Amino acid sequence: MQTTEERNVRDGPDGAASNARTHGSAQMRRGRPMERTWFAFGCLLMVAGVAAAAFAAHGLKARLSADNLEIWQTAARYHIYHALALLAVAYAAHRWSNGLTTLAGWLFIAGIVVFSGSLYVLSVSGIKWLGAVTPLGGLCFLAGWASLGAAAWRG
């Protein structure tokens, strides 16, 4: 049988309540799954966006025409902006966890893939019909921002 002093050393002076607080703090540090997911996606896409911008500055400058280089840089710029937007989605998922934050996150990812992706491919391949696909990615960006705003409004 343990003495009171031994239990206090193990559980703290509040016993089980202290354990619950400790467990709760660990849960808060870990965050909710969607918050972590959006933050991780944002960081990974940010790495890719910065790499794409650096590749344009150092690897593509001598290989692409000025017009195609500008197209690539536009793709990288919007890629980075919306990777940052995913960090805002992570915050919104923490603050106002609702379906609109999830929708915003997926729309931003779709926008990066369609808008920036089509421009990346267009700039290096010259496939002109990709220019017709690009605005669909822009619509995803717009819908993502509208969804994020609605999530905040709804609270």
What does each model-found stretch correspond to?
Residues 1-8:
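Extreme N-terminal basic, low-complexity initiation segments
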Residues 27-155:
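Polytopic transmembrane helical bundles with strong interfacial aromatic enrichment
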Residues 20-22:
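Short, low-complexity S/T/E/D/G/P-rich linear segments that nucleate or cap local secondary structure
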Residues 16, 25:
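Short polybasic linear motifs
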